[in-house]
Amino acid sequence: MLGSLRLAVLRFALAVALTLSAGVAAAHAHPHVWITATSELVYGPDGSFTGVRHTWAFDDMFSTYALQGIETKQKGVYTREDLAPLAQTNVESLKEFAFFTFAKAEGKKAKFNEPVDYYLDVKDNVLTLHFFLPLKTPMNTKEYAVEVFDPSYFIDFTFVEKEPVKLAGAPAGCAIKFDRPNDNSANAQRMSEDNFMNGDNSNYGAMFANKIAVKCP
């Protein structure tokens, strides 16, 4: 069953479709939500990689939709407390999709625990989700990789240009190699909604993965 976040997006997509003029293919392509991201790879005192701290800023349209109906003490001003129920819904929904974060070391996939220290804030009408995704078992390996993407490409992740990924508390000499996805947007535009929903392209979004490789001495 689709999670709350995905259902909300689907309702939003339908609402947009109904506003389009007749004859226009409303849901002709993925993605439906755009996220501008930054990530921080966090290390423990012993030099092990402990998890990923994500900051995900949603696109203007989704931000506006998601904030509808949220009660605030001051109109247009959202506190963390006001947004706490929505933040909880979001992180609970992310579990179904593996938090769109995939880690691997020495040829083996690493598993994450559920997010902690999560909250939402709003700045310049943009809704941003902050959370820390801890590894179930911290990594003490010299090399590892992390990828961020939605396998179904329902959501597009674009990392900021300046300092898209940072190391926090890493041992001296550790270096990051960050690769953005190739531009396959034209192909995505040519794929209809039916193509995505029939299951044949359940991992289509892997072509749009943001790839992070870390190497330490």
Whereabouts are the PLM-identified features?
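Boundary at the C-terminal end of the N-terminal hydrophobic targeting segment
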Residues: 25-29
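Early extracytoplasmic/domain-onset interaction patches
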Residues: 31-58, 62-64
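Mature, soluble, non-transmembrane domains
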Residues: 106-217
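Structured domain cores in non-transmembrane regions
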Residues: 61-139
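N-terminal secretory signal peptides that target proteins for export/translocation
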Residues: 1-8
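Bacterial N-terminal signal peptides
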Residues: 10-23
